[in-house]
Swiss-Prot record:
Keywords from the UniProt entry: ATP-binding, Isomerase, Lyase, Metal-binding, Multifunctional enzyme, NAD, NADP, Nucleotide-binding, Potassium
GO biological process, alphabetically ordered: metabolite repair; nicotinamide nucleotide metabolic process
UniProt protein name: Bifunctional NAD(P)H-hydrate repair enzyme Nnr
Coiled coil: none
Annotated catalysed reactions: (6S)-NADHX + ADP = AMP + phosphate + NADH + H(+); (6S)-NADPHX + ADP = AMP + phosphate + NADPH + H(+); (6R)-NADHX = (6S)-NADHX; (6R)-NADPHX = (6S)-NADPHX
Organism placement in taxonomy: Archaea, Methanobacteriati, Methanobacteriota, Methanomada group, Methanopyri
UniProt cofactor note: Binds 1 potassium ion per subunit.
Name of the gene: nnr
EC number: 4.2.1.136, 5.1.99.6
Region (NADPHX 1): 54-58, 128-134
Residues reported to bind (6S)-NADPHX 1: 160
Region (NAD(P)H-hydrate epimerase): 1-217
Length: 499
């Protein structure tokens, strides 16, 4: 299995959230690399060439384990010690010092002239999967020296990715290490698929399988929604339209609007009936004098001026949800989040990957005729079948939220609390998913992030307010999760294991 650098970073961060610290993963990775080096080459002497980041930390651990097996090891640190900001790498450098393993520091390219690179094996631990582009000095010169040694007969082993190779595209913008063997940590990175005459091995860093399947801080931190141009202007960070509300349900669309705003979008429009109070100054209202919303009411809004539309909160069972969704499917190019009564119209619409459906178990059963089993695996399989069949994203709400992608990938959200059974939290979720989708423009990613953020916000609200929280409280805690994604615990992770 080959994965992107973004996906690998997501998995690492989610592992840390589960309690598997970076030092633990680094120790396992480096020990695994050392075993591969010994098993493949049985070297007498090895030079481990390390950078100042996490890949260098893997190299420090590799050197220590090679030394413990009786291999003559030297470590070359390409960069200044004080430039190491990764705590686990810094810790493992100190361990090398205490183990008496020599570490030579290279501050500029001239320092490389005295280094003997012609060993039995050189381990490339300069740069990992998070770095791309042209190499800077003295790293570039170190790569050239490694390649000279390779041509002279030295075996070269790269940790995770050959330094200089783009981890995703496999392109080489400048120069790259000419490795004989690449030892991938956890999963092979996509970029190595383009390598020829290079052996691939994979070692386990101790990352649990569940870290790949859950939604967590890694989903949020690796998302593009964090990026804001200092010169950006109003509307550039997302514009959301909420379509909902009726004379019977006046609060639901307001809560969805609040969720979108708290997710960080710039502008939120609300198309609703005039019975809904226009009492939020942050929302731009488009109210029509009608009992319920109809497709022709879409003329009241500029669909070209929004990125994402939410259909359903408070819409009412008698609204023409089929007509509204059909019109949107034909005339709107952005993401469409369908919740609550909006789901009643799904059967009459050609759904595609622009759609994110957010049913609870009863709505899922009603709309898709799928009986949901009691186990998480049964529910996951049902979501997978429907999301693949429709070609859209489905977020099935529950104790553990199940998110299915158009191509059948399944993720689980394990945040949340029973206190969130209070009315309106689903409306907040629809708004948050829309807010995220307006910025990342990808339905599955938005659903994963939205579920994690809202569940975490509910946990924080309960921690502060106990059982008496409201949907508004949950919305108010959304920015706190965006600021600190680590604040909530993976409350329902034991439910996953139990199933």
């Amino acid at each position: 299995m080959f994965i992107t650098s973004k996906e690998m970073r997501r998995i690492e961060l989610n592992s840390r959230w589960l309690g598997f610290e970076e030092d633990f993963m680094m120790e396992n990775a480096g020990a695994g690399v050392a075993r591969v080096v010994i098993g493949e080459y049985s070297p007498n002497d090895v030079l481990v060439v390390c950078g100042t980041g996490g890949n260098g930390g893997d190299g420090f651990v590799t050197a220590r384990h090679l030394d413990s097996e009786g291999v003559d090891v030297d470590v070359l640190l390409v960069g200044r010690r004080e430039a190491i900001k990764n705590e686990a790498a810094e810790l493992n450098l100190r361990r090398l010092d205490r183990a008496g393993i020599p570490v030579q520091e290279v501050r500029d390219s001239e320092d490389l002239e005295s280094v003997d690179f012609e060993r039995d094996v050189v381990v490339d631990a300069l740069l990992g999967f998070g770095i791309r582009g042209r190499l800077r000095e003295p790293v570039r010169s170190a790569v050239l020296r490694i390649n000279e040694a390779s041509r002279a007969g030295t075996r070269v082993v790269s940790i995770d990715i050959p330094t200089g190779l783009d981890p995703d595209s496999g392109e080489t913008p400048d120069v790259a290490v000419e490795a004989d063997l690449v030892v991938s940590i956890h999963r092979h990175k996509r970029g190595v698929r383009k390598l020829r005459d290079v052996f691939l091995r994979r070692v386990n860093a101790g990352i649990p399988e569940i870290a790949e399947r859950i939604c967590g801080p890694g989903d949020l931190i690796t998302s593009d929604i964090w990026r804001r141009d200092p010169w950006s202007h109003k509307g550039q960070h997302g514009r959301v339209l909420i379509i909902g509300g009726s004379r019977k349900y006046v609060g639901a669309p307001q809560l969805a609007a609040r969720g979108a705003l708290r997710a960080g979008v710039d502008l939120v429009f609300l198309l609703t009936v005039d019975a809904v109070p226009k009492n939020d100054p942050n929302v731009i209202y488009r109210a029509v004098p009608a009992e319920r919303l109809e497709p022709e009411h879409l003329d009241e809004v500029d669909l070209e001026g929004v990125d994402t539309v939410v259909v359903g909160p408070g819409l009412g069972a008698d609204a023409d949800s089929v007509g509204i969704l059909r019109e949107l499917a034909e005339s709107f190019d952005g993401m469409i989040i369908v919740d609550a009564d909006g789901l009643r119209g799904i059967s009459g619409v050609n759904v595609d990957d622009r759609f994110v459906l957010t049913p609870h178990a009863g709505e899922f059963r009603r709309e898709f005729g799928e009986e949901l089993g009691r186990s998480l695996e049964d529910r996951s399989e049902a979501v997978r079948r429907v999301s693949e069949e429709l070609g859209c994203t489905i977020l099935l709400k529950g104790r553990v939220d199940v998110i299915g992608s158009p191509d059948g990938e399944i993720r689980w959200n394990v945040t949340g609390t029973p206190a969130m059974t209070v009315g309106g939290t689903g409306d907040v979720l629809a708004g948050v998913v829309a807010g995220v989708a307006a910025r990342c423009r990808e339905g599955f990613e938005a659903a994963c992030i939205g579920a994690f953020v809202v569940g975490s916000a509910g946990c924080l609200a309960e921690r502060r307010l106990s059982q008496g929280l409201t949907a508004e409280d949950v919305a108010e805690y959304v920015p706190k999760v965006l600021r600190n994604p680590w604040a909530a615990e993976p409350e329902a992770v034991t439910e996953v294991r139990r199933d």
